[in-house]
């Protein structure tokens, strides 16, 4: 098994830290630790005092229960916090989901262009990957009729990215429901990378987890939260 490197990450690893002006960054302006701790109206002293008393043990191997409960509140569905997994970033979450769901010979449909691990990892795992292309003439949205033509009785997984990286396309609630209907017609899972979810008006944005029972969604605190 061979995993391809992420080309843009390879380039950034070499160039981003020495750049005078960084126009390739994919997050909002980063917060300082002081700015982050001040969000609750305190100066951070209480946090550091408590941190000084913490023992350097393994901590929550299965993930902090409090963190999981707070994440569950971000969604409309009544989620069981035990179904929320803390991982090493959104890429790690995508990797874990794909390792569980994809087996050699599976048929996977991936939105394209998109964050390359969403199609390269399934391919490395031995899946047959087909692209569901965003179309310039549709203002860089996908065509649901194309997805209907691509899906097969043996389709295991549909990978989407909402909002899209790198295009920025936001899939409407109506489109997400149509995707869910297509996936349900063959019993496929949907993996939705929602790392740029809060970039859209959060009142109008809908998560795939609130729409489809066989959805797995991933997110991170590194992009729009800049933590």
Description of each model-found segment:
Residues 23-26, 71, 84, 108, ...:
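Generic structural signal for small/hydrophobic residues in well-ordered secondary structure
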Residues 26-30, 91, 115, 164-166, ...:
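Short, solvent-exposed loop/turn segments at secondary-structure junctions
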Residues 2-89:
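N-terminal small-domain helix-loop-helix segment of the aminotransferase-like
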């Amino acid at each position: 098994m061979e995993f391809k490197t992420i080309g843009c990450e390879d380039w950034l690893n070499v160039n981003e830290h020495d750049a005078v002006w960084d126009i390739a960054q994919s997050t909002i302006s980063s917060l300082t630790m002081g700015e982050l701790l001040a969000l609750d109206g305190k100066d951070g002293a209480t946090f550091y005092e408590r941190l000084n008393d913490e023992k350097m043990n393994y901590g929550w191997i299965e993930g902090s229960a409090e963190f999981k409960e707070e994440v569950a509140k971000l969604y409309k569905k009544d989620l069981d916090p035990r179904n929320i997994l803390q991982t090493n970033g959104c890429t790690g979450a995508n990797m874990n989901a794909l390792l569980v769901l994809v087996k050699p010979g599976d048929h996977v449909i991936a939105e394209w262009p998109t964050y390359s691990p969403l199609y390269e990892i399934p391919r490395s795992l031995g899946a047959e990957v087909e692209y569901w292309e965003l179309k310039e003439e549709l203002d860089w949205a996908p065509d649901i009729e194309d997805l209907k033509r691509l899906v097969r009785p043996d389709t295991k997984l549909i990978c989407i990215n909402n909002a899209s990286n790198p295009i920025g396309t936001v899939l409407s609630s109506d489109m997400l429901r149509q995707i869910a209907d297509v996936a349900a017609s063959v019993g496929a899972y949907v993996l939705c990378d929602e790392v740029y979810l809060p970039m859209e008006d959060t009142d109008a944005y809908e998560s795939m987890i609130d729409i489809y029972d066989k959805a797995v969604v991933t997110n991170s605190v590194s992009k729009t939260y800049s933590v």
